[in-house]
Design a protein with these regions (language model features):
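Beta-propeller domains with acidic blade repeats across secreted/periplasmic ectodomains
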Residues: 1-78, 99
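Extended surface/linker regions that mediate inter-domain or inter-protein docking
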Residues: 1-18, 53, 127-129, 287-292, ...
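Short beta-alpha connecting loops at secondary-structure transitions
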Residues: 7, 32-40, 64, 176, ...
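Structural detector for internal amphipathic alpha-helices that build alpha-solenoid repeat scaffolds
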Residues: 64-69, 89-102, 121-135, 140-146, ...
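Buried hydrophobic core positions in alpha-solenoid tandem helical repeats
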Residues: 78-79, 109-111, 140-142, 173-175, ...
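Short inter-helical turns and helix N-cap capping residues of alpha-solenoid HEAT/ARM repeat scaffolds
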Residues: 86-87, 118-119, 148-149, 181-182, ...
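Short linear, low-complexity motifs centered on an aromatic residue
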Residues: 233-251
């Protein structure tokens, strides 16, 4: 896309500007491999850098550069219109300006825009602006969580779960989103519920964790992390985990228990070890955790468990 005969040319970042031009950050330095050159080397340049502005000049090369928009001079109506721009930077900067003004008229216009949006972009960015102004109704979030467009549903879930408290209605919708047909929506729901530990969310995440496709490494890891966050509080182990008897659910809980040292998680492992039946290194890790963090009763049990006559002598020795 872009080359230079200048041997100091070091492009390190690229952004699209609100004017539609591309801005390329040029570190501009003689040194290429910084791990090879001492910090005190005189060839290191500490004073210069360049920003390249790249824009279309037309087939004849005579087209003028695009003008830079002045958001501070725009009316509320112009800013709201730009929330629907095809240029993401334009949308973001227009939203930032609306929030920075803290204008009551802007809030009213934003509320009107989300009720009759020109397009999905305008609706989403108007809602984020209202959320930042603490003026976004929960009903509006509920509406877009079920929007036909997956990217809109993702934003709705992120808005809902960014709140300090997730009310029951929104929580139910986010839980249902775990069954969405779009992977981006699912991972947004998983990551969002991770921020709101509760018995209902734990149940939803645990059920999802046992069904998620392990070949989807991102979603699989996100569900694992979310499950851990649901039981990070030691009190959480006294609820659903202690009552569960489903082998798949217990294995999923045991997986995260090993990453949460403490008496509660160790007690869970001791009580459910016979049902979980961990193998190899997982079993050794569970035994070590129980003997380290468990109660005296847990430790007594684990000794009898390991001495079971049906167990190989080599495994008992380990």
């Amino acid at each position: 896309f872009m080359t230079s005969e200048d041997l100091w040319f070091r492009p390190v970042d690229i952004k699209m500007g609100p004017d539609g031009a591309l801005y390329i950050l040029d570190f501009y330095n003689k040194v290429i491999g910084h791990y090879e050159v001492p910090l005190t080397h005189p060839g290191r340049d500490r004073n210069r850098g360049r920003i390249w502005r790249v824009f279309y000049t037309g087939k004849d090369g005579k087209q003028s550069p695009p003008p830079l928009p002045n958001f501070t001079a725009m009316s509320v109506e112009e800013l709201i219109k730009n929330l629907g721009s095809k240029n993401q930077t334009m949308r973001i900067m227009a939203g930032n300006e609306l929030v920075a003004r803290e204008d009551g008229d802007a809030t009213k216009s934003l509320l009107a825009a989300i009720n009759k949006p020109a397009d999905n972009f305008q609706q989403v960015h108007a809602m984020w602006a209202l959320l930042r102004l603490n003026a976004l109704p929960d009903q509006a979030i509920e509406t877009i969580i079920t929007n036909p467009a997956p990217f809109v549903r993702v934003h709705g879930i992120k808005m809902a779960t960014s709140k300090p408290q997730l009310n029951e209605g929104l929580a139910t919708l986010v839980q249902k989103a775990l069954e969405d047909t779009d992977g981006r929506v699912q991972i947004a729901a998983v990551q969002g519920l991770a921020q709101h530990p509760s018995e209902a969310n734990l149940k939803a995440i645990l059920s999802f964790r046992t069904k998620v496709n392990q070949n989807d490494s991102h979603l699989y890891y996100a569900s694992r992390l979310a499950l851990r966050e649901q039981v990070r509080n030691p009190e959480a182990w006294k609820g659903l985990p202690s009552q569960s008897s489903d082998p798949l659910a217990l294995k999923a809980l045991a997986d995260v228990a090993l990453g949460l040292p403490g008496a509660s998680s160790a007690g869970f492992l001791a009580n459910k070890l016979a049902l979980i039946q961990p193998e190899g290194d997982r079993e050794i890790a569970a035994v070590r955790m129980i003997t380290r963090d468990g109660t005296d009763a847990d430790k007594t049990y684990i000794v009898s468990y390991m001495k079971n006559a049906q167990r190989p002598k080599a495994r008992q020795a380990e």
